[in-house]
Amino acid sequence: MNALPPAIFLMGPTAAGKTDLAIELSKVLPCELISVDSALVYRGMDIGTAKPSKAQLAEYPHRLIDILDPAQSYSAADFRSDALAAMAEITARGNIPLLVGGTMLYFKALLHGLADMPAADAQVRAQLEADAQAYGWQSLHDQLAVVDPVSAARIHPNDPQRLIRALEVYRVSGMSMTAHREQQTAQSTEAAASGRQQLPYTVANLAIAPADRKVLHQRIALRFEQMLDQGFLDEVLALRSRGDLHSGLPSIRAVGYRQVWDHLDGKLTRDEMQERGIIATRQLAKRQFTWLRSWEDLHWLDSLASDNLSRALKYLGSVSILS
């Protein structure tokens, strides 16, 4: 019997069928589901994220879905903290945490840990907010561009939360947020290479995807078309009508949302929006495969197989997760 409690990772590219398999597993195992998806954390973003339906979530609850407003930011460190808390609660009930999703950075952060970012400093933050009031947010963004051009390129001038945090990190530590993240990545990669795990669980790693990449591309295109038929444009229109969201926010930069937003801005025709949305989703899947190829002890399942549940259960039994 393992000294550490069990956990299951169910990973894979977008449109591979992860959610359906996770639900099937939860029907026959003492599992509770935790979402590992950087877009599903946002409320009001249902169609474009292929979020499980309200009926599915009512019957098979997922932790870490609909926990944030789209105006907020969410980091890998935030996820790790939230996921560890959820896993501890699930384990305390005698159940198995089943983490399902495609945000591979989150899985890696959970498994191998992250170096700590500098803590918030109230005095520094107050000074930055005062500067913003006096000189405007663009002035702070210009400051960030000097000390951390990489962060400045990805943070919109109208995203005060992330802008202040990036400048705060630099002023408190003397290192840019980009440098800290590079350090985190290096330490996490070193931990992975050496087999050092920072997660107090015995983890079984499952991945699901079509064996033929062309099939995945077809599924991605079909799903994007279905999203449009289901009212994806209306969903983004509702987000725009709030007046406090913009294209620089992490939520709006999510695959699909960015392209629809640009279409509604008049930058893309509908056909261009659809084509670019599908291409962006395929590029996301390619990045996910790149992460998965380097993942150790990964058991693959074919999305098109009819017996994935029994195959998954057989594997979980073979690695003593179910003992």
From Swiss-Prot:
Record Gene3D superfamilies: 1.10.20.140, P-loop containing nucleotide triphosphate hydrolases
Needed cofactors: Mg(2+)
Cross-referenced Pfam families: IPPT
Describe the reaction catalysed, as an equation: adenosine(37) in tRNA + dimethylallyl diphosphate = N(6)-dimethylallyladenosine(37) in tRNA + diphosphate
Q: Which annotated residues bind ATP?
A: G12, P13, T14, A15, A16, G17, K18, T19
Kindly state a single biological-process term from the GO annotations of this entry. Answer: tRNA modification
A single Gene Ontology MF term assigned here is:
tRNA dimethylallyltransferase activity
User: What does this chain do?
Assistant: Catalyzes the transfer of a dimethylallyl group onto the adenine at position 37 in tRNAs that read codons beginning with uridine, leading to the formation of N6-(dimethylallyl)adenosine (i(6)A).
Recorded protein name is tRNA dimethylallyltransferase
What species is this protein from?
Answer: Pseudomonas savastanoi pv. phaseolicola (strain 1448A / Race 6)
